[in-house]
Amino acid sequence: MDLLATVSTVAISCYALLSAVYKGTQAVYAQPSTITSMSDDLLGSDLWPSVDVIIPCYNENPRTLAACLASVATQEYAGDLHVYVVDDGSGNRDTLVPVHHAYVDDPRFTFIQLGKNVGKRKAQIAAIRISSGDFVLSVDSDTTLEPEVVTKLTERMRDPAIGAAMGQLVASNRTDSWLTRLIDMEYWLACNEERAAQARFGAVMCCCGPCAMYRRSSLLSLLDQYETQLFRGKPSDFGEDRHLTILMLKAGFRTEYVPEAVAATVVPDSLQAYLRQQLRWARSTFRDTLLALRLLPSLDRYLTLDVIGQNLGPLLLAIAVLAGLAELVLTNNAPWPTATIIAGMTVIRCAVIAFRAHQLRFLGFAVHTFINIFLLLPLKGYALCTLSNSDWLSRKSVSVPPEGKKPIIIANPIGRPTVSSVSGESHHTTGRSRAPSRLARSDSVHSAD
């Protein structure tokens, strides 16, 4: 039985060494760098690019959607802004009507109603194909934006080498429970450590869906690949943000992180919902890591360390924990070396995070160690064994409207709102100061049968 103790100790020691190198290097590269902003003389001028905000919506809570749209409508942006709200076959459309009607006099808003649920990816594409802005900002329907998010992201995207950029995510419902507080800390780490370090080399590996901006010219060149993603010969319908980011990097574009562009999103408030989300994300990460491996030779060596740290680290920890538990069960001997190293790493890690964030609340992140070991590690193992499963896992069981092939586009012409008929005519609206564009027909939107 000494073999189990040896395996556990060696594995946890290797894990500690890898974590020290990986997290230490990450902390160095995650330090804020100075990025020059657009000069003040450009503000209010015609040099600001046009931006299309696309908001896919499926069975969203009306109050949550209203908050999202209000935050977009009040963006402090000097350029043309147009908003496309895509209802992806929601079963609660009647409850959303008052939310839509609040913007019937705003010429920047267009509402697209798909005949059936086709998934977030195709809902995005429906709006992308009929919009024309220089940049596309994808926003989740449960997310609210700080007033300068569009401006901050656009400033960073002025470099033509940048294909995508994401903002900093926080939990809008952070104070609801211990779990939402913990997830908010997870988001801070994911953004201000992981993404910030990757952005130092222009290679953010996942521009998160709640708030991500794309250069239209880059996006259109990748749209067919994005729409038809397959895994083991089957359509892959989730992890769209990570896959699109990898496609951007594969095409030679830079991907960035903008911490000043803050977006607040609703996070799971129950353990069951949280684990479903983590399972979906784990499958997506494993799938696209296989694609990302081919990119590593063309990226900075730090990204290789990043991939190793995120994949080999959990494996070493799992081996250490399993061997330690086996030792405890079979010999009644506690794996004290393993437990001591894990406890020490947890204390040091939380103290460093609290110091970097200047927030004592991160000392409570120690709770995450237990969740990681006893829930997330087994979940990742299950995800690895079920990679071909493309179930979204979070779709609410609400009756969907009758199936239809063509979407209905409800546009707001300047001065007078109009609702299109089911048969197809629609009116494409203009931005705040954009010249009137051509009328868009509903059959120009590609929705799945």
Question: At which residue positions do the language-model features occur?
Answer:
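N-terminal membrane-anchoring/stem segments of glycan-assembly enzymes
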Residues: 1-45, 376-387, 433, 437-449
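Alpha-helical transmembrane segments of integral membrane proteins
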Residues: 3-17, 304-311, 315, 337-340
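Short hydrophobic helices that act as membrane-entry/anchoring signals
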Residues: 19-22, 26, 180-187, 191, ...
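Membrane-embedded multi-pass helical conduit in multi-pass membrane proteins
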Residues: 37-45, 309-391
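Non-transmembrane catalytic domains and loops of membrane-associated enzymes and transporters
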Residues: 38-296, 426, 432-444, 448
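Membrane-interface alpha-helices
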Residues: 41, 84, 385-409
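Short juxtamembrane and helix-loop transition motifs at transmembrane-helix boundaries
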Residues: 296-305, 329-331
